[in-house]
Amino acid sequence: MLHRYVLVEILKLRRSLALLLCLAAPACVAILVTVMALDRETPVPMGTLGIQAAALWAFAMMPLSITALSVLMAQMEHGPRSWDHILTLPGARPRVYLAKALVMLGLLAAMQLLLFVLLNLAAPLIASLHAVTGKFDAGAVGGTLARMGVAAVLVCMLQLWVALRFRSFVPPLILGIGGTFAAIAATSARQGAFFPWLMSVNMLASDERSQLIAITLGGAGGLVALAAMLVHLSRREAAA
């Protein structure tokens, strides 16, 4: 039965801007990194190109994209008041919420993959138009982006939880934007590895302990948040 709910959620994406967002966000990062590289007066160090892109993605574009994505997915139901019918169906509540969570995580993975592909296309383009040093390490970049995706699961679930809980789009926007800017301000803080919006950023840390803490809390914590969201939302009335 769950696969039917997931399929319905995927079909609903055609009516929203979610797919456009998932294409535009990684593309913006890849384009910006390419423009910055071509604007250099010195040779481009290809070994750090992927790290620069991953940092820009983890610090700002990914958390803001997750915020917007959670709002878009929730407003597909809140806007036309679809909850009033869907949530009255027997056993529908946990399945609907779980399907939305799975689709959102799938879209996050798709954005990570698209960014990886675009960076692999940008690297030879930069090398053909500008002097470069070193080589683009596709394997390292892919691994970093994959770990960032796992570490971002907790933020995804928190954002989706708030977006589904409130009919207004303001609370999830405040949470996402506030969390992103708080992460930027607390980047060098000792407790940064425990802050959800910094967990993906910590995949760039030289300290392996910080990376391990962030990916463990981000991944496992995301599953715990998902379970808590399903229990909470399944026991309450349609979002007010």
Task: Outline where the language-model segments fall.
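Transmembrane helix boundary and interhelical loop/hinge segments in multi-pass membrane proteins
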Residues: A68-H85
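Secretory targeting signals
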Residues: A30-I66, S70, L98-F166, D207-R209, ...
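Hydrophobic alpha-helical transmembrane segments of multi-pass membrane transport/permease proteins
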Residues: R15-D39, A55-L69, L173-T187
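Aromatic- and glycine-rich beta-strand/loop motifs that create alpha-glucan
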Residues: M1-L23
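Short loop-to-helix capping motifs
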Residues: R15-L17, A92, R167-F169
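Short helix-to-coil transition segments within interhelical loops
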Residues: L87-R93
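Terminal transmembrane helical anchor/hairpin motif
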Residues: L32-Q52, L173-A240
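Transmembrane helix-loop junction
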Residues: M76, L89, P124, S128, ...
